[in-house]
UniProtKB/Swiss-Prot annotation:
<keyword id="KW-1006">Bacterial flagellum protein export</keyword>
<dbReference type="GO" id="GO:0006614">
    <property type="term" value="P:SRP-dependent cotranslational protein targeting to membrane"/>
</dbReference>
<comment type="function">
    <text>Necessary for flagellar biosynthesis. May be involved in translocation of the flagellum.</text>
</comment>
<dbReference type="GO" id="GO:0005047">
    <property type="term" value="F:signal recognition particle binding"/>
</dbReference>
<dbReference type="GO" id="GO:0015031">
    <property type="term" value="P:protein transport"/>
</dbReference>
<dbReference type="GO" id="GO:0016887">
    <property type="term" value="F:ATP hydrolysis activity"/>
</dbReference>
<keyword id="KW-0653">Protein transport</keyword>
<keyword id="KW-0813">Transport</keyword>
<feature type="binding site">
    <location>
        <begin position="312"/>
        <end position="315"/>
    </location>
    <ligand>
        <name>GTP</name>
    </ligand>
</feature>
<dbReference type="GO" id="GO:0003924">
    <property type="term" value="F:GTPase activity"/>
</dbReference>
<dbReference type="GO" id="GO:0005886">
    <property type="term" value="C:plasma membrane"/>
</dbReference>
<dbReference type="GO" id="GO:0044781">
    <property type="term" value="P:bacterial-type flagellum organization"/>
</dbReference>
<dbReference type="InterPro" id="IPR000897">
    <property type="entry name" value="SRP54_GTPase_dom"/>
</dbReference>
<dbReference type="InterPro" id="IPR003593">
    <property type="entry name" value="AAA+_ATPase"/>
</dbReference>
<keyword id="KW-0472">Membrane</keyword>
<keyword id="KW-0342">GTP-binding</keyword>
<dbReference type="GO" id="GO:0005525">
    <property type="term" value="F:GTP binding"/>
</dbReference>
Length: 373
């Protein structure tokens, strides 16, 4: 990417110059206020101007973008295959592993395998988790846990499921939440804003949801309580300007309107917003959705190049297995879990201790979330 700097009087002027001079291949990367002497070196005549850094995409950038799109197409095709096999067979053939006879597992291992399946984890994935947690006991000629059950299963789940445990400490600059209607994106964004601020991050919030007045007012009121800047963007250009105005923030949270993953036109419209800057997109899914609906959402929202997953409404299902299956099969890192409407209490930063407890224990025993955030 070729970098150029221009000096202007306002962000609006910068955008107009960039569009006229560089066209669609350019993006504004950052801006800062500087002072320039108008008459020699006399400091009293220094004028404030805006220095804007512009990135112009070159052939190599387009090649990398093409490669990313090709990888994205492969991921979507793989998800389509998974969905079709789940519809037709109830399982994914490619996950078939070497089955061990029931007598080859120690009794306690069999109990935990049953518990995983009862929690709605796919039998193939449950077997994989159990096998990775076990070693062969030569004396008794059975497979048993390598350590205590919790420790062994935690190590296995850590091997098979990706979590981003550093999301709050080291967030991307711009975090956008997308997902189907009704999964709780706006409430989740408010919870994240509180967590980031609690961890000494300078936070900004931008809403792209121009359809729901109630959601806008709710988020605006919360931003005022947190004392963080809040903006509403009704166009990609306005969004670009607001991102630049919040360039001093450590993390900028972007709320989007809920969209049906079948509404391709609305999704394409949202895509135009995300072309203006380097944005990390996190797909928000309710844990009580059917597994097939989750995969369908991932396929459609996959056009945004998903950086990770957020699972909400864990309090509304006693069977978190579908969530585990999706995380395992897509290998997208999970960044947080939410449960309930209370802000900021009902959120847990993704961590393996919580996930193992969620899978192995009853809902009431894992509900105290704030201690783990």
């Amino acid at each position: 990417m070729k970098i150029e700097k221009i000096e202007v009087n306002s962000l609006q002027e910068a955008i107009e110059i960039v569009e006229r001079r560089f066209g669609e291949n350019a993006v504004i990367l950052s801006s800062r206020v500087i002072r320039k002497n108008r008459f020699g070196f006399l400091p009293i005549f220094r004028k404030k101007i805006l220095e804007v850094t512009v990135g112009i995409r070159e052939e190599e950038d387009f090649r990398k973008e093409f490669e990313r799109e090709r990888e994205l197409i492969k991921e979507i095709e793989n998800l389509k295959k998974i969905v079709n096999e789940l519809i037709n067979n109830g399982e994914v053939k490619g996950e078939k592993i070497v089955e061990k006879g029931s007598d080859t597992y120690a009794p306690r291992v069999k109990r935990y395998l049953e518990k995983l399946v009862i929690k709605n984890i796919s039998k193939n994935i449950a077997e994989k988790i159990i096998q990775d947690a076990c070693g062969y006991d030569i004396d008794n000629k059975i497979y048993d846990f390598k350590d205590e059950p919790y420790t062994s299963l935690r190590e296995s789940i850590e091997k098979n499921i990706k979590l981003n445990e550093e999301f709050i400490q080291n967030p991307p600059k711009v975090v956008a939440l997308v997902g189907p209607t009704g999964v709780g994106k706006t409430t989740t964004l408010a919870k994240l804003a509180h967590l980031f601020k609690k961890n000494k991050k300078k936070v900004g919030i931008i809403s792209l949801d121009c359809f729901r007045v109630g959601a806008f007012e709710q988020l605006k009121a919360f931003a005022e309580v947190l004392e963080v800047p809040f903006k509403l963007a009704d166009s990609p250009r306005a969004f670009n300007i607001q991102l630049l105005e919040m360039d001093d923030r450590d993390v900028i949270l972007v709320d989007t309107a809920g969209r049906s993953h079948y509404d391709v036109i609305r999704l394409k419209e949202l895509e135009t917003y995300f072309k203006v800057s380097d944005i990390s997109v996190y797909l928000t899914l309710a844990a009580n959705l059917s597994e097939l609906v989750m995969y369908e959402a991932i396929m459609q929202f996959g056009m945004f190049s998903i950086s990770g997953l957020i699972f909400t409404k864990l309090d509304e299902t006693p069977y978190p297995g579908s969530m585990v299956n999706v995380a395992y099969r897509t290998q997208y890192p999970v960044v947080c879990f939410t449960m309930g409407q209370s802000i900021p209490e009902d959120i847990v930063v993704a961590n393996y201790d919580y996930l193992v407890r969620l899978i192995l224990e009853d809902e009431d025993e894992v509900r105290p979330a704030t201690q783990l955030a």
